[in-house]
Amino acid sequence: MRRQTVLVILAPMAAVDRQQPRAAMASLDEAVAGVWAVAALGRLAESGTLARLGAGDGRLDDPVELADARLLAAYGLLEADAHGYRVPAGSALTADASAGVAREHLLQAIAHTRGQPPGWQSGDRAILHAQGRASTRLAGVIEDDLLPRMPEARDALSAGRGRLLDVGVGVAALSIALAERFPGIHIVGLDVLPAALEIARTQVAVAEMRERIELRLQSVAAITDEDAFDLAWVPQTFIARDELEAGLARVWTAVRPGGWIILALAGDSDGGRVDAYHALLATILGGGPMGVQEGTELLERHCHSSLICSEALHPQPLLLAQRRP
């Protein structure tokens, strides 16, 4: 007896009550794709391939690297051309910064899934190193975007006689990067996390900058320096709100007339995905979300001056700057 082949077509389930789960799964797929894009960025950066693409050599022979590049191109982080892939013109996607950002966020995300408590208290050396590596890009932001608007601080740092206060110095990566850009300046770095300062001391010694970078186990609210600094860097994201409230007045006193405070804000969420992510990260790190209006009010409240010079100077991190007259 001849058998008949029966073709069964499985039609999409069109029931209304199935649409919501489908939409949720699609959103989850997009979120997971973003995680893997960060991982792909880190892999290409760590291997040296990203630097090679940035230098104009777009050939990729390894199938995994090719898949990494395709994913990054889908997110606009790379561009495809006839010769392979390239870093978009004008991109801040340097290999070292990309590696640091990727490693930092992936490690923090894993720690978050394991229930790590919020606040600047993690002693995880890998996370601390990654955060430091990611922070070095801010040295370029300070030199290229901020200091041109701060003539007194710019002149002091450029002349090699400036003094800088780095609140939340961490592993001293930003301090070292700034000391390299401005030979001769002196930096005081504060932190309340002994594990971070232990790494920082090693990093400063390796960089041969122990005479130029002073590290203190000290809260920003406990500093007693007066008229001592041309520039102060205060990352709100890492500082608990009560400590920040108490510390800003002390920083204002520590900055000399004509000096500047840079307040780096986490931003606040308007319901968008990226803003919601920044708010989550800021909550995890201990400072919580803070936008321009709240940051400006904070400066006005604690930096006692009739001349307020606060303005949003940079999109992310969101930076406010105020000059002491």
Regions found by a protein language model. Name each.
Residues D230-L244:
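A short SAM/SAH-binding and catalytic strip from SAM-dependent methyltransferases
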Residues G258-A266:
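Conserved beta-strand signature within the Rossmann-like core of class I S-adenosyl-L-methionine
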Residues G287-C303:
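Short alpha-helix
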